[in-house]
Amino acid sequence: ETSDLILRTLDAGAHQHRAYAGEPLPTFETVARACQALGLHANVEIKPAQGFEQITGETVARQILALWGSAQLPLVSSFSEESLVAARRVAPQLPLGYLCVRPPEDWMRRMDALAAYSLHCAARKLDDSVIATAQAAGIPVLCFTVNDRQDAEALLARGVTAVFSDRIDSLRGL
């Protein structure tokens, strides 16, 4: 565990290139403001420490409401259903993404219980029957982590709504 005081002293840019030396770690507020200024739609993934699922979900939801206000709210996802339930309780208006590596047999029931907007799963673990079921129900399917343009094109052609990528530069124009 590292305190906020220490985190604020770290250099987030020097290891990328000397031109970025001295760049501080971005805060949640900084990222929220940048997304709003640039017109970007954010996906906020809740990653709670074990035993802190509920409080983390609640805290993230409160922060989102404080930072986004009446602007388009970010999509909120998590592998922790408990965190998503807590976020929903605090902010019923938040669009939630049900996050799983491979959709379980009862993924639709879980999404219904969460009142989730979208299904997020690993690109390599997704089968066409899930895509078809989701499409029939009007549920967007988002896949992670897709860094290859041809893979992204193939997923979109299969009916996936969007992809998460570490290399958005390679997916330009899709």
Predicted regions: what they are:
Residues R18-A21, G97-L174:
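C-terminal active-site rim and adjoining tail of enzyme catalytic domains
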Residues E1-Y98, L114-Y117, C121, Q135-A137:
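Metal-dependent phosphodiesterase/phospholipase catalytic core, i.e.
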